Amino acid sequence: MSTARINMLEFDSEEDLNQRAEMYQREAPELFPNAEILLTIKTGPTSAMSVSIYPDEKSAEESLIRRNKHFKAAEVQPREAWYLVGEVVQRHVK
């Protein structure tokens, strides 16, 4: 069964969020090659939620190492970041 990681991010400014989103759009497919789905939603002027779907828990755990390195090295840092992990129980993509 697929595993999802949901990241919640809060930035100091809308500009920081936009810069980070542009960088993530360019780099995420290469950073997380095992991801089946990479999705980012801007939930407010300075906040975003990203959802990554992996084929299994092992792939999700392996990506966490890359995620943590990426977060530490990123030029634009979120003010606050946390994540949840769970089993995907329903998926529909049209």
Outline where the language-model segments fall.
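Short S/T/G/P-rich N-terminal loop/turn motif that feeds into the first structured element of a domain
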Residues: 1-51, 55-69, 76-94
